[in-house]
Amino acid sequence: MKQSVSAEQIELKSSLPGSKKVYVDGPREGMKVPMREIEQSETNGVPNPPIRVYDTSGPYTDPEYKVELEKGIPTPRHSWIMGRGDVEAYEGREVKPEDDGVKVASKHTPVFPQMDRQPLRAKQGANVTQMHYARNGIITSEMEYVAIREGVEPEFVRKEIAEGRAILPANINHPEAEPMIIGRNFHVKVNANIGNSAVSSSIAEEVEKMTWATRWGADTIMDLSTGKNIHTTREWIIRNAPVPVGTVPIYQALEKVNGIAEDLTWEVYRDTLIEQAEQGVDYFTIHAGVLLRYIPITAKRTTGIVSRGGSIMAQWCLFHHKENFLYTHFEEICEIMKQYDVSFSLGDGLRPGSIADANDEAQFSELETLGELTKIAWKHDVQVMIEGPGHVPMHLIKENMEKELDICQGAPFYTLGPLTTDIAPGYDHITSAIGAAMIGWFGTAMLCYVTPKEHLGLPNKDDVRTGVITYKIAAHAADLAKGHKTAHQRDDALSKARFEFRWRDQFNLSLDPERAMEYHDETLPAEGAKTAHFCSMCGPKFCSMRISHDIREYAKENDLETTEAIEKGMKEKAEEFKEAGSHLYQ
């Protein structure tokens, strides 16, 4: 009997406090671009305008939307894709039990009800990538949508994609995705990793993690499932994901050969690529830069090869003493990618796993190969981003960005942190956010989040929330440092609310309103404390902002500028001191 995953099984929350979902009409009929509007209260009768911010939460925060996971979410891109006239529906490959890592399909696996839908692919001789359209001077609906989200002109979006400086990951089989862009001249993006393992997690939990991560601001998610039900879990996630979904196909290919790396073949891997492309995966991490000649260089490392995909391919290369089949078949992979518009995320299989190994010969040798592969992908008009480290101390971070921009001709950089120290298990979301903020400032386009469970275990829901928020902080700090034209507006609004003691506005304007209110209410839970002109840190007598208010009020009453009021007040206090006898202690 077929099971199902219902909305009742998982926690789906509405919009954040003080916020509402709004839509901006696009230039094409029916195009509605989501935003989150944060309302603000008045200041002495003077209205404070609402603040609109980028929204990744999909329909789940729309009060008018009824969640039905078994049907999937709306498909805003479907008409755009079909309207271009360059795709066709076809039968697709047969879904087999081995796709879920089993020999016989289990009746207990919650099969997605619409698994029989026909996938799309490019018509014979066509190329359906956003890069292909951009290079041919076409501004697609997806590009127009992105331009509204980013606050730029559509032509700027087209040019950045055409030049390879940005990617718009948008598989034609993932029409549910709300278009977004990854590039250093746009907002810095954040990816959240989810996925089951052989020892933990269920399909319902992973769908919930996806909706949870996007609620807190994840711009993309990667399904890194390595346990059973990989295909089915991915189907549930993609059909309900409003953001692009990435995978590492070698993980599933390995499951198909019972976890024995040396039994992997190009044929098994190729079949897996097509399977996932038909489902709608938007970008693939492919470790094609792990070459046979680079593997011995890692022997002198402190932590060797720490990438799962990198170690799998290294083991295969050494066992067969052959070159990496992902490298030798790269042109064929490009042919598959452009049929579905799957973007490359060229994997850093030799990334450093400790600061002792940062910026070493193995890491930068692989980067040279990724630069070579980028040129090949671009020859096919396939979109590319480059994955980066890893564990890198602060003084070595900038070199990574400079080398990537030079070697990979400006392709977007997508980094895991980097972690800036190795001594803080349980706090690696912090050690990595330090590096993430720096490398984002230097030009990284997307940051892969790290949770407190990094190196320790599979993250739960709360870990996902902490990881996403931590990385949204790093990404926003980078946007501010780069001078993004709208980045400071939210900061300015929150600072004004803080100075005016509009506590609820402070909470609502923050990245995590619920956590901010929770911490405030631990010491001042009364409703009256939400309007008090102090908090529990300094109390009523020592609040610096309250004192600043008093100075301004004094200046106003005495018809003085604020600086004059301070000087006058200081003189008055000096006279009081003299009159009291000029004693330091009375």
UniProtKB/Swiss-Prot annotation:
Residues 22-33 have a biased composition (Basic and acidic residues). One of its GO terms (biological process) is thiamine biosynthetic process. [4Fe-4S] cluster binds at residues 535, 538, 543. One of its GO terms (molecular function) is zinc ion binding. Zn(2+) binds at residues 391, 455. It holds the Pfam family ThiC_Rad_SAM. This is Phosphomethylpyrimidine synthase. Substrate binds at residues 193, 222, 251, 287, 307-309, 348-351, 387, 414. The keyword rRNA-binding does not apply. Catalyzes the synthesis of the hydroxymethylpyrimidine phosphate (HMP-P) moiety of thiamine from aminoimidazole ribotide (AIR) in a radical S-adenosyl-L-methionine (SAM)-dependent reaction. Keywords: 4Fe-4S, Iron, Iron-sulfur, Lyase, Metal-binding, S-adenosyl-L-methionine, Thiamine biosynthesis, Zinc. InterPro entries: ThiC, ThiC-associated_dom, ThiC/Bza_core_dom, ThiC/BzaA/B. Binds 1 [4Fe-4S] cluster per subunit. The cluster is coordinated with 3 cysteines and an exchangeable S-adenosyl-L-methionine. It comes from the Bacteria.
